[in-house]
A protein has these predicted regions:
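Exposed beta-strand and adjacent loop surfaces of beta-rich binding modules
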Residues: 1, 133, 142-144, 162-164
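Short proline/glycine-enriched turn/loop motifs at strand-loop junctions of beta-rich domains
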Residues: 137-143, 160, 172
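Short, ordered, surface-exposed loop/turn motifs in non-cytosolic proteins
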Residues: 130, 140-150
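A short, solvent-exposed loop/turn motif at the edges and junctions
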Residues: 167-177
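Exposed beta-strand face motif in extracellular beta-rich ectodomains
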Residues: 161-165, 185-187
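Viral virion structural and adsorption modules
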Residues: 5-6, 15-136, 173, 180-217
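Short, solvent-exposed S/T- and G/P-enriched segments that are highly enriched in secreted/extracellular
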Residues: 147-159, 176-177, 181-183
Length: 217
C-alpha cells in the first residue's frame, strides 16, 4: 500500500504497492494523514444548525439564554469592527455555522472546548456541550486509582468520552475497565485478595496429596 497525490490537484489516494496511477506521485503517510485532517476540518467548519436549535441547546446544556449570550459578546475584549460583525451575525443569521468565531470565544467562557463544539454541530445533540464526572471509591483505602493514565480518583470529561481506569494494590487482584461515559458516575471498586501466590497452610498431622508424607510440625 502506498499513498499518492495527483499532480496539479488536491486529490490524494491510497494505491496498491507498485501500482502508482499515471499522473500521481507518491507521498508520505504523514502528508496523507495531514490531508485527511484538513478535509475533516473543512467539513466541520461547514456544519450548520438553525439558530433556534443552537439557542435551545445552550439553554439545555448551560441554562444560558440568548440575551446572556449576546451580552457576553458585547462585553468581550474585541475591537469595535469585529464586535459589530459578531453581533450582526448573532442577530441576523438564519443558520449558525460552526466556523462562526464567536462560538469558540463563548465556548472558552462557558467551559466548552472546540472539540465539544465540533461534536455538537456534527451530531446536533446538546449533550455534547456538557461534561460528566467520574468518581472512583476504592477498597482497600490505600489502593491506587489511575484514570486515563493519571493517578486520580476523580475526573471531569466531555460527554461521550471514553475513559479507562485501573485500581491496584499490593496483595490484591487489580481491576481494569474502559467505557463511554454519558452521565456522572460514582463507582465503588472493591479489590479481591490475591491468593494465587499464597503458600497453603497445612494443618498438623495431615497427609499431603503431593508427597504422601505426614506433616509433623
Amino acid at each position: 500500500m502506498i499513498y499518492a497525490k495527483e499532480l496539479g490537484t488536491d486529490m490524494y489516494s491510497i494505491c496498491p504497492e507498485g501500482k502508482l496511477p499515471v499522473g500521481f506521485v507518491e507521498v508520505t503517510e504523514e502528508e496523507y494523514n495531514e490531508y485527511l485532517k484538513n478535509k475533516e476540518q473543512e467539513r466541520i467548519a461547514q456544519l450548520s444548525m438553525r439558530r433556534g436549535d443552537v439557542f435551545e441547546a445552550m439553554l439545555l446544556a448551560k441554562n444560558i439564554g440568548k440575551p446572556e449570550l449576546r451580552a457576553m459578546i458585547e462585553q468581550a475584549p474585541l475591537d469595535d469592527l469585529t464586535k459589530a460583525l459578531y453581533l450582526n451575525r448573532f442577530d441576523e443569521a438564519i443558520d449558525f455555522y460552526r466556523s462562526f468565531p464567536a462560538f469558540d470565544m463563548l465556548g472558552e467562557t462557558l467551559g466548552i472546548t472546540g472539540a465539544m463544539l465540533d461534536r455538537f454541530f456534527d451530531t446536533k445533540d446538546w449533550h455534547y456541550l456538557t461534561t460528566c464526572k467520574l468518581t472512583i471509591n476504592a477498597t482497600p483505602d490505600n489502593a491506587i486509582v489511575v484514570i486515563n493514565s493519571e493517578i486520580v480518583n476523580e475526573v471531569t470529561v466531555p460527554y461521550g468520552s471514553v475513559v479507562d481506569y485501573t485500581v491496584s494494590c499490593d496483595g490484591y487482584e487489580s481491576k481494569y475497565d474502559v467505557f463511554e461515559i454519558t452521565k456522572d458516575e460514582v463507582l465503588e471498586v472493591v479489590l479481591d485478595e490475591d491468593t494465587a501466590n499464597t503458600e497453603p497452610i497445612i494443618p498438623d498431622e495431615v497427609e499431603t496429596e503431593s508427597t504422601g508424607e505426614v506433616n509433623e510440625e
